[in-house]
Amino acid sequence: DTQALATQTLCQSSTPTNLTITVYGGIGTNSYQWYRNTTNSTTGGTLIAGATNATFTPPTATVGTQYYYCVVTQSSVGCNVTSAVSTVIIVAAPAITTQPASSSVCENGTPAILTVAYTNGTGTPTYQWFSNTTNSTIGGTAIAGATTASYSPPATTVGTLYYYCEITFSSGGCTSVL
């Protein structure tokens, strides 16, 4: 049989890689039942209602580590085989805790410094500030050299500009937050 993915680390509420079992040999029709466990073991797990296919999509809404395994039973002879354990680690999604504040400034005046802060990021963060002519975090233009948690926008152009910062993390399954 082909075992499910050994370990995956994911960001909370992200899309996981499906766990899939392929069984070779035997007689009759295979039936599948997936189990969840709080320990790295194929005994004592909790049956997952409705998880009766060769493929199972582990949930990612709750932070923590869960262990999954599948018991495959052949109907005609009553034999069964249990897969190896698949570990699914869900890490807390990063979130912006300090957003840049809006402000109005006269041309050639001194604008307020824009600052961002975050929680739950894993790894070394990198920052990239963007400007946009619309109030959106899509389609902005990366500002050259604006790669720290704070940015001092220029006040040399009349009109409205919107700024936002993308924080990217080097590891932990959670890559970025706006």
Q: Where do the model's predicted regions map?
A:
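Proline-enriched interdomain boundary motifs that mark the N-terminal boundary
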Residues: 1-7, 92-99
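Extracellular recognition modules
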Residues: 33-35, 67-73, 128-130, 162-168
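A short beta-strand segment in extracellular, disulfide-stabilized domains
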Residues: 14-24, 109-118
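Interdomain boundary/hinge segments at the C-termini of tandem beta-sandwich modules
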Residues: 86-92
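Short, solvent-exposed loop/turn segments at the edges of extracellular beta-sandwich modules
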Residues: 73-79, 168-176
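Solvent-exposed loop segments of extracellular immunoglobulin-like
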Residues: 24-36, 118-131
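Surface-exposed, flexible coil segments in extracellular/virion-facing regions
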Residues: 35-61, 131-155
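Short beta-strand segments of immunoglobulin-like
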Residues: 5-11, 101-106
